[in-house]
C-alpha cells in the first residue's frame, strides 16, 4: 500500500482543516504539499491526528490543505498590508485553526511559536515592504 508519513509541513489537521505550520519557507512548503498530493497516497499518518485511510480521504485532505495554505497566505498578506500587527495576525490564525482536535492535542505554546515563525516568512516572501 501507499502510506505517507507526514510532517507538520503538510499541515496539522484539526478535524476540519489542515493548518499550515511552516518554519523554513512558505513557498517551499506549498511545493512540498503539491508533491505529496501527487503521490496518490492510500494512507497518511498525520502528526497530532493519526491515520487517514483511503485514497479518497487522502485526496480530500490534500485538497483541503492546499485550500488552507492559500487562504492563510492571502489573509496574512491582506492583514499585513492593512496594518495589522504580527501578533494580531497570529491571533486570527489561532481562532481559525487552534480549535477542535488541534486545540486539545497541539500545545498552545507550540502553536504560537510555530505561527510566530510562519507569519514573518509569509510577509518576507510575498510583501514588498
Predicted regions and their residues:
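Catalytic core of the metallo-beta-lactamase
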Residues: 1-31, 35-38
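Charge-dense, low-complexity intrinsically disordered segments
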Residues: 19, 23, 59, 63-66, ...
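Membrane-targeting and insertion segments and their boundary/processing signals
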Residues: 3-7, 46-50, 93
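Broad hydrophobic/π-residue packing in well-ordered secondary structure
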Residues: 5, 29, 45, 68, ...
Amino acid at each position: 500500500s501507499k502510506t505517507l508519513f507526514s510532517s507538520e509541513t503538510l499541515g496539522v489537521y484539526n478535524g476540519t482543516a489542515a493548518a499550515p505550520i511552516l518554519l523554513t519557507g512558505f513557498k517551499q512548503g506549498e511545493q512540498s504539499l503539491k508533491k505529496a498530493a501527487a503521490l496518490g497516497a492510500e494512507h497518511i499518518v498525520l502528526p497530532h491526528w493519526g491515520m487517514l485511510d483511503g485514497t479518497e480521504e487522502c485526496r480530500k485532505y490534500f485538497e483541503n490543505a492546499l485550500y488552507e495554505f492559500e487562504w492563510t497566505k492571502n489573509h496574512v498578506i491582506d492583514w499585513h498590508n492593512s496594518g495589522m500587527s504580527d501578533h494580531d495576525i497570529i491571533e486570527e490564525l489561532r481562532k481559525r485553526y487552534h480549535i477542535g482536535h488541534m486545540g486539545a492535542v497541539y500545545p498552545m505554546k507550540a502553536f504560537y511559536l510555530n505561527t510566530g515563525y510562519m507569519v514573518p516568512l509569509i510577509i518576507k516572501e510575498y510583501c514588498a515592504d
